[in-house]
């Protein structure tokens, strides 16, 4: 501090500019000398903004069946905090600034939409939805996947992830009429992990609404699954398929393989297809290991 230094025998060096910026979520700063030896180290206290804590991307329609009907849905996952969206903006993927838009604050649990073309979106979904505005400067979501980044009012990163149009991302969203929906969004699910996304329950998605099926207790298998696995053989390939309920997001379904009914693993099986039926169910097809005899099971765990 200037009040205590520099004093006799001390000096202050000011260098700049440095690349990037300090994280509001806290981090460790380490000073190294020219031999990479640590000279000093300090830990910064986390001071995230409300937008960084509670704003989340909950649904993305990047390749709609109707031209121009793209949208991004955001949600305030807080139960008590209203988010001020002034100066919150998209800085990658599409261009949009909430300042002066039709929606500048977001109540607890509320959702807001940013769309590519308001006319096309209204034709597809109707009027009266909470649309903040349209993507600026002719920007649009890439059909092949891209990075989406949102900054808070201070310019710090609030949301930053990339989606793709190939497995393990939901393939039905690539022109099949479905959106991608972030599972367990209220618990802070990581949007950068493909396994945390699924196809929307119905074609067209559910802008401004949730399509989640709450778990009411009871049998986890009945909650998550709509059919038992079916094993099929074609030439040298053996597969099994099952239907699960899109929106049963509180359940984790894992396909597992064993040669002896003792040791089970999921790495030996290969997911070769996912196909929603347009009525809220999706069929997954998995391939058995080549030239192998063994057993398969589905393990269903409901998150606490």
Regions found by a protein language model. Name each.
Residues 1-193, 200-214:
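Activation on beta-sandwich/Ig-like modules and their edge loops
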Residues 200-304:
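Short, composition-biased motifs enriched in small/polar/acidic residues
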């Amino acid at each position: 501090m200037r009040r205590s230094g520099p004093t006799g025998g001390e000096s202050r060096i000011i260098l700049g500019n440095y690349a990037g910026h300090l994280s509001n979520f806290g981090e460790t700063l380490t000073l190294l000398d020219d031999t990479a030896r640590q000279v000093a180290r300090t830990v910064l206290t986390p001071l995230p903004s409300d937008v960084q804590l509670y704003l989340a991307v909950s649904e993305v329609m990047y390749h709609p069946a109707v031209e121009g009907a793209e949208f991004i849905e955001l949600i305030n996952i807080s139960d008590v905090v209203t988010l001020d969206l002034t100066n919150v903006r998209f800085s990658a993927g599409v261009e949009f600034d909430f300042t002066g838009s039709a929606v500048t604050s977001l109540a607890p649990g509320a959702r807001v939409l940013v769309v590519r073309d308001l006319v096309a979106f209204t034709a597809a979904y109707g009027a009266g939805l909470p649309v903040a505005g349209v993507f600026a400067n002719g920007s649009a979501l890439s059909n092949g996947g891209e990075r989406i980044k949102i900054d808070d009012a201070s310019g710090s990163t609030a949301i930053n992830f990339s989606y793709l149009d190939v497995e393990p991302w939901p393939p039905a969203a690539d022109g099949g009429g479905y959106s991608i929906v972030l599972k367990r969004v209220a618990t802070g699910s990581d949007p950068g992990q493909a396994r945390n996304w699924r196809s929307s329950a119905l074609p067209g998605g559910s802008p401004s609404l949730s399509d989640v099926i709450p778990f009411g207790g009871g049998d986890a298998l009945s909650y998550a699954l709509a059919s038992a696995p079916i094993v099929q053989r074609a030439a040298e390939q053996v597969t099994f398929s099952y239907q699960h309920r899109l929106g049963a997001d509180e359940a984790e379904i894992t396909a597992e393989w064993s040669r002896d009914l003792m040791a089970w693993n999921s790495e030996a099986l290969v997911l070769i297809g996912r196909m929603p039926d347009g009525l809220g169910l999706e069929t997954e097809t998995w391939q058995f290991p080549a030239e192998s005899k063994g057993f398969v099971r589905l393990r269903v765990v409901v998150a606490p």
